[in-house]
Amino acid sequence: MDCYTKYLAENVLSEDKVVTYRYLSRALRVHVNTAKQMLFEFHRSQNAKCPNTVHATYLVYGRKKADAEQPSALKNGDGDIEMTSSPPEAESISEAVPAYSLSLIPEDRLSDALADYDEVFSIHVYSIGPHPNKDVALLADAANATLNLESKGDVTQLRAIINPRARRREQQGAGLRAAAAAATVKSQAKSIFPKPPTAPSTSQVKEAPKASQTVEETAEKATLSAPAKKGSSAPKSAASSGGIMQAFSKAAAVSKAKKQTPALRSATPASVEESIPQPLSDDGEDDEDMPQPKPSRSSAMKTKKQREEELRRMMESDDEEEKKKKKEEEEEEEEEEEESEHEQLPAEEEPMAEEPKAPEPVKEEPAEIITATTNGRRRGKRKVLRKKQIMDEQGYLVTVTEPAWESFSEDEPPPPSKPKATSLAPATQATKPKKGGKGGQGSIMSWFAKK
C-alpha cells in the first residue's frame, strides 16, 4: 500500500492540494472507508516525522446538547425575552424532536466542538492539506475536483450512494445544445403528425395539415394572380409582338411561384413547432432562458471568407496568366531579334561559322558584333544583362539577371588623329588672305604721301 503514500505526498506536500477521502477513493479505486484510513495513517506518520506538516479536517455527526441548540437570546436569566406585546402561549402539541447535526471541524478546534455534542455517532478524517483550514472555499474546490474526476467502471464498488433514477447530463457547447433541441422538436413533430390517418385520435392533427395546405394553395393563387394582373396592365402592343415572349414570361412566373411555396411550407412547421410546449429541464426551469446560438452570423462570416478566398484565387490565377503571357512575348521577341540578326549577317560569314568541324578551344564571345557600316553609321548587336522574373519550383517569383543580345544603330566615333589635321588646315588658310590684304590696301599716311 505504498502507492497511496506516494500519491498523497505528491498532491499534498509537493503541489499543496487539499485531498478528500472521496477524491482519494476515486483516484486509487478503493473503498471510501479504506480511503479514510489512508488519510488518517498518512496524517499520523507525517506529523510523527515532522510536526505540523499536514493538517486534517474532521467530519463529526451526532446530536448536540439542548443548551447549545438554543439561540443566544434565550440564554438570559430565566429565558424570557422582553417584548412590547407578547402573544398568548401556545400549548405544546407534540414532543420535542431530536436534531442531528453534521459539521466539518478543523483539527485545532476539534476538542471544543466535541464538547458541544451530547452524543457522537461517527467521526472520521474528511480531508488533509498542507496548511490549517481557515477557508471553506478550499473544501468546495476539492469537492468540485471530485465531481470532475471521471469514475471509470462501476461506482458502486466504491460504495458511492447513487440514485438509480438520476440522469447525468454532460455540459456541452451551445451548438450541440441547439442540435439536440432541434432533434427533440423534430421527434415531437413526427409524433404529432403520424403517417396512418385512420386513427381516431388524429382528428385534431388532420386539421393542422389541412390548414397548412389551404395556406399553401392561397399563396400559390396569389403568386399566380399577381403576374397575371401585371400582364393585363401591360400595353397591347407588347402582347402583339409575339407569343414567344409570353411563353417565357409565363415560365418565369411559374418558377417564382414554385420558389415561394417551399418558403411557406418551411414557415408553417416553424409556427407549429412554436406552439408545441417544450419540455422543462430537471431543475424545473424553462430552457428558453438559455442563450441560443446564432448560426446566421457564423454562416455569413463563412460565406464572406469563402468569397474572399475565391477572389484571391482568381486574382492569383489572372496574375500568373499575365506573367506567362509576358514571358512568352519576351521569348518570341528575342527569337525574332536573333533571326533578324542572323539574316543581316553577310553570306560569307555564315558558312565560316558552320565550316569548323574540328573541336577548337572555347573563345570568349565579343561584347559587340558590328554587322554593317553605312554613311558613318554602324549597326550590330551587343551583350546586355537583363533582369527576368522566373517562377521557381516552390511557386515563388525570382528575379534573375541573364546575358542577352541587343541590336543597336549609332554613329561611328571619329578617329582621334584626323581632327588635329583638320584643325591645322583652316588655320593656314586663314593666315594667307591676311597677308594679301596688307599688301593691297596700305595705310592712310601712304595715300597722303603719294599726293
From Swiss-Prot:
Region feature Disordered, mapped onto this chain: 187-241, 259-386, 404-451
Biased composition (Acidic residues): 329-353
Ranges annotated as biased composition (Basic and acidic residues): 306-316, 354-366
GO CC field: delta DNA polymerase complex
Annotated domain remarks: The PIP-box mediates the interaction with PCNA.
Role description: Accessory component of the DNA polymerase delta complex. The complex is required for the maintenance of genome integrity, acting in concert with the sliding clamp processivity factor PCNA.
GO molecular function: DNA-directed DNA polymerase activity
Feature: compositional bias, Low complexity: 225-241
Keyword field contains Metal-binding: no
Biased composition range(s): Polar residues: 200-216
Pfam families (alphabetical): CDC27
Protein name, per record: DNA polymerase delta subunit 3
Xref: Gene3D superfamilies: DNA polymerase delta, p66 (Cdc27) subunit, wHTH domain (3.90.1030.20)
PANTHER family: DNA POLYMERASE DELTA SUBUNIT 3 (PTHR17598:SF13)
Subunit and partners: Component of the DNA polymerase delta complex which consists of PolD1, PolD2, PolD3 and PolD4, with PolD1 bearing DNA polymerase and 3' to 5' proofreading exonuclease activities. Directly interacts with PCNA.
Gene responsible for this protein: PolD3
